[in-house]
């Protein structure tokens, strides 16, 4: 997926991050307010009323963010389709023949279908977000701490504050599985863009009589897909890849079956239509070999050897953990828990040092934009 599409998705995701921060702030503020009460002054009805008002406000903001983002989804997916039409693999063939109006209509209809399905999924995700469940659990903990006369209120509510900040707004699936809303939305939008890129390219290729597929390629590939990325496969052999069977590329190299299909299970590769008559491979053998060699050479971090792919995965994990700790720090700030805020800052500082080390040793460009959290204010560690 291109940089422009990634930027568009990141811009859209800021809306949901803002709602998530608002959710954290509201819960934390109410926890702090409850802590100022005592067993005789606590009023459960008033607390539940305030909670209900806040939940309605959060839900409305989430609905607005979702509705606004639906327009973005259609724009993002149209851009993904436009990239297919300008793909260099089709340039020469399109000089010889044009795409029929019927084929264009099918491709457009498919793109619209994916757009509508993704829009429905985003709406469903927002509607199944457990705002009230996690909010109520945190408030119940706070009320119990005050009602029982605990002397150390902050210690009693600290775990609840941590959970609110670390988990954020959660989607609850029918299976009972929980996942952060922002993570679920981002993955669904990316999956849809990749579906359009791959399947519209295949539809174009079928219309033009293309006989093969070229797999996309990138540096720091996962080990199971690295040997085959950037290679060209007949349609029959690509089907073997997807169905877990042995396969060959068009040069005759035989490969063992792989478990993870292309474009699935968090795979960022896609298959693009390729003509052995018209198309020119996007990636040379020399480039693919260099990427593989650089990946294997890897780097040593804290006495352990990592491939560059593994180092990249480690950086993504650290980025996620720093964001989570910043969310907890925001919750601690609004709950007035300075000790928790200090603890978060120490973890953030330690993670940031490790992140810088991994980036320096691996040569991977740091992505500090992935670690920003609205409302986070660093504090000086005591």
Regions found by a protein language model. Give the residues of each.
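N-terminal leader/targeting and assembly helices and adjacent pre-domain segments
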Residues: 1-163, 285-382
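Alpha-helical structural elements
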Residues: 11, 105, 130, 148, ...
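Short, exposed beta-strand "edge-strand" segments with a Pro/Gly-rich flavor and a Y/T-containing core
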Residues: 64-67, 173-179, 231
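Contiguous, non-catalytic segments that form substrate-binding/exosite surfaces or channel walls
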Residues: 122-208, 213
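Acidic, glycine-rich two-metal-ion catalytic cores of nucleic acid-processing enzymes
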Residues: 179-287
